[in-house]
Regions:
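Conserved N-terminal catalytic core of the sugar/cofactor nucleotidyltransferase
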Residues: 1-60, 64, 71, 136-139, ...
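Proline-centered loop/turn at the N-terminus of a beta-strand
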Residues: 29, 55, 86, 156-158
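Conserved beta-strand termini and adjacent loop/short-helix elements that scaffold enzyme active sites
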Residues: 9, 31-34, 90, 116, ...
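Catalytic-core segments of class I nucleotidyltransferases/pyrophosphorylases
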Residues: 57, 64, 69-81, 94-98, ...
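Structural beta-sheet core signal
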Residues: 6, 58, 87-90, 159
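Short, polar loop motifs at secondary-structure junctions
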Residues: 11-12, 92-94
Length: 179
């Protein structure tokens, strides 16, 4: 990873100042959503419009990431490029979630994601996407689930299972349990 783009809305100026005061060896650019929150899909779309890259790794900041995820991430990246797919989501079995209130977003069969009434896998907040999956977007404000649902309908939504403990800062209750 040579370039990092951070999409911001809340506390954008503070985040930008913090990054500018660090001595990171990466090219880091902070992109602001401006007047309106763009939601998850719109935020990623905002980054894509401000970039020339074809493929993007996105990480949600409300997951506690650590070096234990590195091998999983490298394996997921290898699968993505080897199979020339246009998306892949890192998921974890719901029993590995620190927050036992999180029930599941998807099912995983091989590396294909699906949904039904008994979803057992939680989206971790990490995905690799190709800009082409945003070609049909005609609105700047939308949830990433809009894209996922279209891919699910075509049976083209891919997943990769992490076996790490999943810690999502769902709310203040979870934050307090971690302290």
């Amino acid at each position: 990873i040579n370039k990092v783009k951070i999409n911001t809305f809340y506390l954008s100026d503070q985040i930008k100042k913090f990054i500018e005061n660090q001595n990171y060896s990466l090219d880091i650019k902070v992109i602001n959503e401006n007047e309106k929150i763009l939601d998850t899909g719109g935020g990623i779309y905002n980054l894509i419009k401000n970039s020339e890259e074809e493929d993007f790794l996105t990480l949600n900041p409300d997951t506690l990431w650590n070096s234990n995820y590195l091998n999983t991430l490298l394996e997921m990246e290898s699968l993505y490029f080897k199979n020339r797919i246009k998306n892949i989501l890192m998921v974890v079995k719901n029993t590995r979630s620190f927050d036992n209130r999180l029930k599941g977003d998807f099912n995983l069969n091989g590396n294909k994601l699906s949904k039904d009434n008994s979803n057992e896998f939680i989206y971790t907040g990490c995905q690799i996407l190709n800009r082409k999956i945003f070609q049909q977007i005609d609105n700047n404000i939308f949830s990433i689930s809009k894209i996922w649902n279209e891919l699910l309908e075509r049976k083209e939504l891919y997943g990769y299972e992490s076996t790490n403990e999943f810690v999502h800062l769902t709310d203040i209750e979870i934050f307090n349990k971690l302290n």
